[in-house]
Amino acid sequence: MAKLAITLTRSTIGRPEGQRVTVRTLGLRKMHQTVVVPDNVAMRGMINKVSHLVTVKEINE
């Protein structure tokens, strides 16, 4: 099953509350922090919501 490596590349300062909550829900707290999450519809939806703040790489295992 594929996984996604998500890195927070832009700050959430000055962003709407919904975007801040989405970034926190993805497990990101600090700039340049990377988390590995499963590749599913829910995660893809959250990534689309904050795509301008994060970078995503696909990991094949």
Curated annotation (Swiss-Prot):
GO terms, molecular function: structural constituent of ribosome
GO CC terms of this entry: cytosolic large ribosomal subunit
Superkingdom in the source lineage: Bacteria
Keywords: Ribonucleoprotein, Ribosomal protein
InterPro entries: Ribo_uL30_ferredoxin-like_sf (IPR036919), Ribosomal_uL30_bac-type (IPR005996), Ribosomal_uL30_CS (IPR018038), Ribosomal_uL30_ferredoxin-like (IPR016082)
Transmembrane parts of this sequence: none
Gene Ontology BP terms: translation
PROSITE patterns from the UniProt entry: RIBOSOMAL_L30 (PS00634)
Subunit structure: Part of the 50S ribosomal subunit.
Membership in a protein family: Belongs to the universal ribosomal protein uL30 family.
Database matches in PANTHER family: LARGE RIBOSOMAL SUBUNIT PROTEIN UL30M, MITOCHONDRIAL RIBOSOMAL PROTEIN L30
NCBIfam families: rpmD_bact
HAMAP family from the UniProt entry: Ribosomal_uL30_B
Protein name: Large ribosomal subunit protein uL30
Organism of this sequence: Exiguobacterium sp. (strain ATCC BAA-1283 / AT1b)
Gene: rpmD
